[in-house]
A protein has these predicted regions:
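Flavin (primarily FAD) cofactor-binding/catalytic cores of flavoenzymes
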Residues: 1-238
Length: 238
């Protein structure tokens, strides 16, 4: 059966020998993993996402990030994603050569992310969401050092694995298990994973569409609200 990300009671009721698929590899998925592996004999866990990326760790006792001006190396609008990624990598290398850390670059950039977003065209925003947002998220939204250490220890066991794969289908079986059809990244053929339960940690659905709340649908039909063209909630003026 499928369990919501925050339904810890249902997770706790799973047998100690259960095999569980966690859909997602972000913070919510890590929380679910920690809950499922609290017992002395942890369950067998597979974490799955398109890229198989896990959140990066914070540093222990980092210096407070400096609050500076808009970085000169970024440039002004209109920005292109390819150019911006190249500039960020150059800045990371420059700071690393002088004893800095990639986290310093992102910390300095954090107050200016709204301005960066506004400087991207609609096509470039969609390109970011399609190709780069997974990499941005794991570096921007980091784990506490203690949580990162616990995650690292779990990944060294044979009980936890992370897959970069696409979920194709899910079928129930006569004995109450689930057959998960997936295709790993870079592979042409699909494979089947048999699990006891699935925990959905994909996060909120920000796109406003036919499956949205009735009130939102009605407001859109009445032209009182406009969905974001990027699928990020509502279109706003700034």
């Amino acid at each position: 059966f499928v369990i919501a990300a925050w339904d810890f009671d249902s997770m706790s009721r799973l047998p100690s020998d259960a095999s569980v698929l966690i859909i997602g590899t972000g913070h919510t998925a890590v929380d679910a993993l920690f809950h499922l592996t609290q017992q002395a004999q942890p369950r067998t866990i597979t974490m799955l996402s398109r890229h198989g990326l896990l959140p990066q760790p914070h540093r222990l006792n980092p210096n407070p990030p400096p609050v500076g001006q808009y970085p000169d190396y970024v440039g002004e609008a209109p920005l292109r994603m390819r150019t911006l990624v190249h500039q960020l990598r150059q800045e990371v290398s420059r700071q690393a050569n002088s004893g800095g850390d990639w986290r310093d670059v992102l910390n300095q950039l954090r107050p200016h992310t709204p301005r960066l977003w506004q400087a991207l065209s609609l096509a470039e925003r969609r390109r970011f969401l399609r190709h780069a947002v997974a990499f941005w998220d794991v570096h921007h939204h980091r784990l506490a050092p203690q949580a990162a250490d616990r995650l690292k220890s779990l990944l060294k066991t044979e009980k936890v694995q992370v897959l970069a794969a696409r979920l194709l289908a899910m079928h129930g079986t006569a004995n109450g298990e689930l057959n998960i059809e997936l295709r790993q990244r870079g592979q042409q053929t699909a494979q089947t994973l048999k699990v006891t339960a699935v925990v959905n940690c994909t996060g909120p659905n920000t796109a406003i569409g036919p499956s949205s709340h009735g009130l939102l649908q009605q407001l859109v039909e009445d032209r009182l609200l406009t969905p974001s063209p990027c699928g990020l909630g509502l279109q706003i003026n700034d």
